[in-house]
Amino acid sequence: MPLNELQSVVPTRTLGLRENWSQFTLLVLVNAFVGGMVGIERTVLPLLAGAEFGLASHLATLHFIVSFGLVKAITNLFAGGISERIGRKRTLIAGWLSGLPVPLIIMFAPDWSWVVFANVLLGINQGLCWSTTVIMKIDLVGPTRRGLAMGLNEAAGYLAVALAALGAGYLAAVTSLRPEPFWLGIIFVLAGLLISVFFVHETKDFVALEVHQHHRATSTTFQPETFTRV
């Protein structure tokens, strides 16, 4: 980023967890919704596979791992580059848009191939949203709190996986395997999308600020006068 743009960022941005607690908290919440989407599927899909599609639960689990895991891994690989090109917020929104049809597809899937396709979309959703929330938190807190940012992100995501799995399992037990448990998914994806669109802010400026501060600290430490005094 040019120097004049860097200077324009400095007065309006401050690095730190405390300084950016509201945005950081929103991103923790968004990542919890990301984790919740996975929790629902992990609980209900193996049961749904056997009860409605005649598949063994271990085969359904294998399909889930392959279709979801492979796509998520590939998406994770490119998420950082995508967020650099189009921005963190747009990448996050794109991830939620890819996950938007997932609960509906599973609710009304006429055969198992539709469920596999939903898992592919979920893998894209997870790869883009989870990775981007990590990047955005690191942007906000700066170099001294990156470990804490990562820890809070992972804790929120996996706690949500567990709670959503528990909630979806309970709904499946007291109602039916579908559509009731997947109403949770609709709530999660809509909440994540709306928060990302209307409340989450772009964080790339914080990277520019960190670079500016690093350059300023370096230039202050290594002044030319240091050598002339020797």
Can you say where each PLM-predicted feature lies in the sequence?
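Flexible cytoplasmic inter-helical loops of multi-pass small-molecule transporters
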Residues: 2-8, 200-227
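Helix-loop boundary and gating motifs at the non-cytosolic
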Residues: 18-69
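Short hydrophobic/alpha-helical segments at membrane-entry points of transmembrane helices
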Residues: 27, 113-119
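Residue-level signature of mid-helix packing/kink "hotspots" within the transmembrane helices
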Residues: 68-77, 162
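C-terminal ends and interior cores of transmembrane alpha-helices
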Residues: 97-110
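Cytoplasmic helix-loop-helix junction between adjacent transmembrane helices
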Residues: 118-158
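Symmetry-related core transmembrane helices of the 12-TM Major Facilitator Superfamily/SLC fold
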Residues: 180-198
